[in-house]
Amino acid sequence: MNCHVGTKDMKIRKILFGLIFVLICSVGCGPEPAVDLFSNEETSTEQVAEIEHDSTREKYNKGSCKRLTDSPYVLVIFVDDEESSWDTIAVSNYWYENVIPAMAYIEDQANGYGISLSMETGSYATDTSREMSVKYDGIISNYTGDAKATEDLLEQCAVSLGFEDEYQMHEYLQSHTGKEQIVYMIAVNKPGRSYCMSTASNSEYLEHCVLYTVYPTNKVENSMCVAHEFFHLFGAEDLYDPYGKQPRRAELAKEFYPDDIMFRRDEDVYQLSVGSFTAYTLGWTDEMPEECNRQDWWE
């Protein structure tokens, strides 16, 4: 299989990448995806009509993760850096305690809105027996206040795996899996505040999540965090006002969506739900909830 990307195309993509406005909310021709390590080979059985993008859900149908009405391929990259690493046991524990429950939860929530998702999953991780190394050259920052803190993380992961860059890896995965949408979730085995790198522009930017295993307060992260960041990739918005810009929306969310996964945390992800506004931002429904059709929700 030839996955070569032309030099001219590469330069154009690099220029486009530099012009993209990224929003932080708070992922031979190269090795085979490690679907043999952890995989779910089921495929989507149902699709719903595409919903057009509009100004009330500005990141829906944008970037590389456009619609959560089509089952995407989910790739978890377990990356090492100069101060942290993954071993086989840690990878296995994170996979079965966080990733698998999160994917099941997302599929269950989608089903409640009449959306049938059956997501295929795979992973990359350092494997000395296969001479595979997933390594970031340097220290992965856990500071989410700077949009450039980990802007080269996905690229470095791709290069360490033998690809020319993240775009070649993306094209390879699309070809290998037959999926247009690839969800990148980069897991880092150290404390930090997990976040999502997403875009509201029509661009080639490869949206992705950065997931830390431990919250800055030393609280171990769980499947709720994985699902929360996953939803961000497809347009879901925080309802708890993390940046102090929409205090009124947070008040209204507490009244109307107290158990929404985009509003609060919980040790048990099934104590949380996808409320009607979050479903709207994901494109699971095209009807704006009445309680959100008010001026102070948007101020």
Segments the model singles out, each with a brief description of its role:
Residues S39-A49:
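Intrinsically disordered, low-complexity serine/threonine-rich repeat tracts
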